[in-house]
């Protein structure tokens, strides 16, 4: 059985795959050989994916009527993949469908929209990154958006969260793997003069665009009214989501927030030296052992034990008992691209 992946130099690495390598080398090996869990549905993640789907269409100029129709088709595709989770998927589709139009209304009238110059939306990058040993790894990913503000590039990060915590997100930024990985890639695009990125010569920082998920605790966490003596029919599904939309519309600042965090070149340098370069050098050496059997690198391969590995997964059923139930074969390691 051959791996789907041709290694970090030929096929490149995304921050998502790098995170899997960091978490457990053996489970990562199973992943690159095309094995994935069948039952890995995550409602929070899927809501974020629904929101991202809407953002991508909206940034391309689509009207809400088209976005809404496309969102429904997208939700149906998720339900086809996870039929046992259809009620959850329908619920979060309805939440997204009532929240996103209020989001559009809110930011259309906000001055923040006027001062930025949109530069790139949903930009897929594949940029060579030279390591100290001379090897060139391909950094891969997709920017949500990059804008020009006051003559600098600002990376936009869209986040769906149960709570909007300005302090926590800003505090962890300098060692946030996804954001800093993207900033490294952005700087490489600029420095290498890859079109169209040579127009601006500095990075201003990160612009957070945070959306609070309703029905996740706090304001907006409501329940559908049950039938009563005075209202035998109770509250219909449409009435419930209309009420939720009204709560969001009456207090949009509790559900939508944007702010900037400035970054200087030394912050990116620090992330590269303390994390990215060491882990990518290890990844390249580890791959030489996995793909070519280079024995001097065999001790870079290990299985992370329980306790550090958060849960028992379908991978562990295979590793512990040889049971392949719950695993499926995949053909693409980069579905997000």
For the regions a protein language model found, what residue spans apply to each?
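RecB-family 4Fe-4S metal-dependent nuclease core
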Residues: 1-337
């Amino acid at each position: 059985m051959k791996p789907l992946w041709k290694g970090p130099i030929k096929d490149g690495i995304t921050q998502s795959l790098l995170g899997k390598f960091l978490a457990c080398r053996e489970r990562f090996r199973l992943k690159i050989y095309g094995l994935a869990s069948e039952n890995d549905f995550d409602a929070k993640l899927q809501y974020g994916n629904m929101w991202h789907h809407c953002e991508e269409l909206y940034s391309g100029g689509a009207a809400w009527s088209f976005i809404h129709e496309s969102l429904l088709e997208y939700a149906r595709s998720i339900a086809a993949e996870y039929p046992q989770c259809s009620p959850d998927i329908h619920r979060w589709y309805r939440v997204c469908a009532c929240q996103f139009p209020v989001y559009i209304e809110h930011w259309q009238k906000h001055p923040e929209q006027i001062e930025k110059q949109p530069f790139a939306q949903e930009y897929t990058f594949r940029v060579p990154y030279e390591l100290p040993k001379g090897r060139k790894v391909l950094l891969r990913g997709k920017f949500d958006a990059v804008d020009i503000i006051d003559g600098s590039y600002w990376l936009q990060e869209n986040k769906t969260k149960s709570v909007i915590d300005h302090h926590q997100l800003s505090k962890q930024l300098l060692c946030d793997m996804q954001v800093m990985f993207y900033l490294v890639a952005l700087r490489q695009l600029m420095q290498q003069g890859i079109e169209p990125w040579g127009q601006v010569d500095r990075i201003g920082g990160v612009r957070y665009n945070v959306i609070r998920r309703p029905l996740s605790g706090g304001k907006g966490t409501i329940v559908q009214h049950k039938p009563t003596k005075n209202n035998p029919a109770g509250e219909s599904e449409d009435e419930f989501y209309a009420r939720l939309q009204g709560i969001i519309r009456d207090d949009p600042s509790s559900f939508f927030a944007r702010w900037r965090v400035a970054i200087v070149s030394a912050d990116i340098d620090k992330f590269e030296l303390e994390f990215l370069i060491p882990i990518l050098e290890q990844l390249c050496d580890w791959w030489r052992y996995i793909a070519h059997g280079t024995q001097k690198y065999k001790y870079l391969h290990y299985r992370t034990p329980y306790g550090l590995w958060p849960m028992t997964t379908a991978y562990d059923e295979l590793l512990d008992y040889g049971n392949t139930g719950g695993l499926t074969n995949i053909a693409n390691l980069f579905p997000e691209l």
